[in-house]
Amino acid sequence: YFYHNTAECDFNMGREKRNYWHRYSTYRTDAGDVDLFLIAGPSIRDIIERYTDLTGKSVMLPKAALGYLGSSMYYPELPENSDDAVLEFIDTTHEEDIPVDGFQLSSGYCAVETEQGIKRCTFTWNNKRFKDPADWFAQMVKRGIIVSPNIKPGMLLVHPLLEEMKAKDMFLPASDDNAGVDGLAVGTWWGGPGLFVDFTKQSTREHWKQYIKDALLRYGCRSLWNDNCEYDSMVDKDAKVYFEGKGSTIGTMKPVMSNLMCQLSNEAIEEYDPNCRPFSVCRSGHAGIQRYAQVWAGDNLTHWDTLKYNIATILGMALCGVSNHGC
């Protein structure tokens, strides 16, 4: 069964027992219609093939996506010279004959000074940690590394670009029953309250791609890590969503935002460098996310137990059509 609906929902897979009838399953959704697809087999492989006929096949990623992609919050969080520390890490892997093809750059690179202290602010650079982003990207490319900087769809209320983005009408409006801030919906975010970008509006999508180009691609970046895009911290589930002029709520459209964010990352890279094959990484997504990104399952520990859990997670995601998955 494929229940095609983007609103928050609940599955009861036989967990309730009654004396009057046999175990049963239920599906409930908060809003919208349900397109229910019954996908015939007979084999699991046949079902997955037909499911991806509906939702889309996996995006063709660059070869680097198949290799070891290093990642650590430690290096970008250093008080200074994070750029040198990452280069030293890559050099060490080469010296130890550990093949590495990419590096996921966590959000410490954009943690800048604000009126409330150091805060993560997407589309900015901490120049104490990364002195010359263009030179650093060039050094990483020279070492054969594709870098995926972390970007987030939420902007703290102390973000230096917040007023500029508000003037461009990029954020979700608050619901009628919630005043928000200047009429905009406020959610909890890394470091405090923030506003969330509405990717269902064409003008916002164009502005977002331009920010990507100006803050990252012009320095040599050709891959993006789309993070924290679940919109789960948007407590006001009735916050308004533009939805191409038709109007909706974030409670109904939440998973669509992840897919759109990844689609925009790919479009921005393709527009900036038509000869480049985009590589997007994402932590969440709706059915069809495989068309745009490689998905990861969130933070884990460097431990053998994690590896055991990862195998089950990767296989489970593949059964959902997401073959390009890493943990």
Segments (PLM) and residue ranges:
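Catalytic-domain carbohydrate-binding cleft regions of carbohydrate-active enzymes
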Residues: Y1-C327
